[in-house]
Amino acid sequence: YTFLTGRYASSSHSKIFLKECPAGTQALPAFNVGLESDRMNVGRVLEDAGYATGFVGKYHVHDTDHSKEGSLFGDLDVPKNAKYSDQLNKRKFKLEKLQRELVKKNGFTWAKNIYWGNLKSPFKGHNPDWTAQAALEFIEEHKDQPFYLHCCSTLLHGPNGEWFKSMMEKELVTGEGFLKKPLNLIDRKSVWERIQKAGLTEAEVGYLWMDDSLGLILDKLDEL
């Protein structure tokens, strides 16, 4: 929130935050701050300055009270620990497309491959390939004009054990449900081999995995 708006999180005036922490009371910012309806954030400001502004990856800053999405569409994400079904997977896919539009409504000109919040079963699993794929697409589409890309990796969030489990077992899970085939943008086997060669453990794979995903984006920028 602070990086997107330049405001201290405790200065948020989003409705969801003020409902929990009314003005004049002790502020406790956590999962209760969202981008305000004034759209005063880096995406909107740079858009006004002529930039294409893209958002990929983890969002988790939607103010659910400043619009009617909840009443129109129900929950904006699938319930935690819901039983997997093909129908649920299709709903996850459709919700991610709605989430893209909500991110754009809040100030960005382009959004894709969105994680709405924290990872939740049955779609719990990191997939930096999926985030990087959207980042590369945005850069390619806007390489001939000024652009700003906000890329948020889920790998910044633990627990560490989930990094290794995701890397070895969950190459199909994404923020839009399960893919039909892996993206294979990052060599996961190589990540694990280099971690072991460095004398590190499963608990550290997320750092190198994230580094490789960011490397894809930096390499793309170097090509321009």
Model-derived segments and their meaning:
Residues Y1, S12-F17, T64-G70, S121-K124, ...:
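Short, solvent-exposed loop/turn and secondary-structure capping segments
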Residues P29-A30, V56-H62, A82, D86-Q87, ...:
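Active-site neighborhood of divalent metal-dependent phosphoester/pyrophosphate hydrolases
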Residues Y1-N41, V45-F55, T64-H66, W110:
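Active-site segment of extracytoplasmic enzymes that catalyze sulfate/phosphate-ester chemistry
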Residues R7, Y59, T154:
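Active-site metal-binding loops of divalent metal-dependent hydrolases
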Residues L4-A9, G70-K80:
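Short, hinge-like loop/turn segments at secondary-structure boundaries
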Residues G54-V56, H62-T64, L72, Y148-C152:
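Outer-envelope exported proteins of Gram-negative bacteria
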Residues Q87-N106, W110-L224:
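Active-site-proximal cap/lid insertion segments
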